[in-house]
Structure formats: C-alpha cells, structure tokens
Design a protein with these regions (language model features):
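N-terminal targeting sequences that direct proteins away from the cytosol to non-cytosolic compartments
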Residues: 2-126, 181, 198, 220-257
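Conserved polar/disulfide-associated segments of primarily extracytoplasmic proteins
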Residues: 73-76, 94, 111-231
C-alpha cells in the first residue's frame, strides 16, 4: 500500500490541507494504511509551514550549542547522513548537514520530499496491513540572512498547532515549551489524537541551527498505541525505539563510529 504522496502530488502550503484517506481495516477492525497516509501527509504540511514561517525572522542570533561530542553507536543500528546528492529545489536550497542512528529494523525513505528523510517502525498484521508504531521525519527551517533564535520558535509552534488541529481527528495539544534533543536546545509541542479507537501521539521539536548557520531542523515524531512500550504522549521520544534516534542526532555530516 502506498502511504505517502506519489510523485507529482500537490505540495501543500499554509492554508492548503490534504484530505483524509479512507482507512482500510483488518479482520480485527484495526485501522491500517489510511491513517498512516494521513499522518505522513501532515508531516509534509508541517515541513512546508516550517520553511514558510521562519522566513520572517531577521537579526536574530543562534543560541545553539556548537561544541558537542560524537554520539555512541547503539547495537543493531544504521547511520543516516544527510547528503546533497540528488537534492533539488527547496531541499537543495535549504540543505542542512545532519546525521543520526536508527534501528536496523526500521524502514527508511530518504527522499520523502519535502522532508529530507523519514524512518518508520511498523507493525504488519496477518492481512498484510501495516500500522505506524513510531515515525520520525526531518525537515528544514530557515531564516533570512541570519540564524534562527529559539525566541521565534513559539510563533512557529502556533502555526503548527493550527494546522495539526485541522488535520487530526480529536486533536488536542497537551504541552508546549523548551526542550532538549541530545545536546541541543529547542522548542516543542506535543499532542494527542484518536481515530477509530486508535490513539496517536505526536511531538514536534524545532532546533535552531548552530552559530554561524541559518538553517535549523524540524523533527516530527508520530507514535501510536500499537507500540507496546508507549502508553501516552509523554512517552514519545522517551520510551520505545525513538530515543536511539534522538540521542544520536547531530548537526554536521557525521561519521560512522
């Protein structure tokens, strides 16, 4: 099942909204595929907003830590290093050097435009349907001429919140504030949603770029109650397998250890 927009699909901008895909169901009545497709479309909307919303910033200084240690490589992981190769359009213009480790069992899509990369942990049932258990995508955020400052990020979070509330069934923002992803300071919000008795939990973390750079990243995390280690939105990125990714995320090209 294709669960992301095909080549040539519309690039949704602020004010535009993807439509919900009709869900498929397994014999157990679980939602498969359709809600996953919706979530991935929403990730694309988020990144489009991110690229748009932060063009308004001017004369702000980055507060991001630039002296960080290399991450340790956990067992049974692969490294993703973002590359300019094959990039075009906005992804080329707004390229960000970053890397992270992710579990070998996760599926990777390294060209899910307008995101740089998306990795996903899935549960496949007996009917061949699949559920998103944990999902992680990286997009860019950019300032004009100067680096982003975390003081601007609450304004971006407000734009995100408006878009998510229009897209997710039974959406509710539950928290917002400063956060830390590995060695980096940032700003995040978390939310819950529910569709056909499946609970979804989301976390969007925005990281300003290191000093001297103008492009940061938006880390979009979606999880569901099909991940047995998770019991609520507070667990996203704290339990399950997402912490391996977050702890190893680094600005810069990275190198395998």
């Amino acid at each position: 099942m294709q669960n992301y927009p095909p080549a040539g699909a519309p690039n949704y901008q602020p004010g535009g909204a993807p439509q919900m895909s009709p869900p498929l169901k397994s014999k157990k009545g679980w939602i498969i595929g359709g809600i996953v497709g919706c979530l991935l479309l929403i990730v694309l909307v988020v990144i489009a907003i991110a690229g748009f919303g932060l063009y308004v910033s001017k004369n702000l200084k980055s507060t991001q830590n630039t002296n960080v240690s290399a991450p340790s490589r956990a067992a049974n992981t692969k490294q993703y290093v973002n590359t300019r190769e094959g990039r075009s359009g906005k992804l080329a213009d707004n390229f960000v050097d970053f890397s992270f480790y992710y579990p070998e069992s996760w599926e990777i899509d390294d060209s899910p435009e307008p995101n740089f990369v998306r990795v996903e942990r899935k549960l496949v049932d007996d009917d061949g349907g699949n559920f998103t258990q944990e999902n992680f995508a990286v997009g860019w955020v950019s300032a004009t001429g100067t680096a982003l400052d975390k003081q601007l990020l609450p304004k971006l979070a407000a734009q995100f919140n408006q878009q998510f509330s229009a897209q997710f069934p039974n959406y509710k923002k539950v928290s917002e504030g400063e956060t830390r992803i590995g060695p980096y300071e940032g700003y995040e919000f978390r939310f819950t949603a529910n569709k056909n008795d499946v609970d979804f939990w989301g976390r969007v973390a925005m990281l300003p770029p290191p000093a001297g750079q103008t492009k940061g990243v938006a880390l979009v995390m979606i999880a569901s109650d099909r991940a047995p280690e998770l019991s609520g939105v507070e667990d996203v990125g704290e339990k399950g397998e997402l912490p391996v990714i977050l702890d190893s995320f680094r600005f810069g090209s990275g190198a395998s250890k």
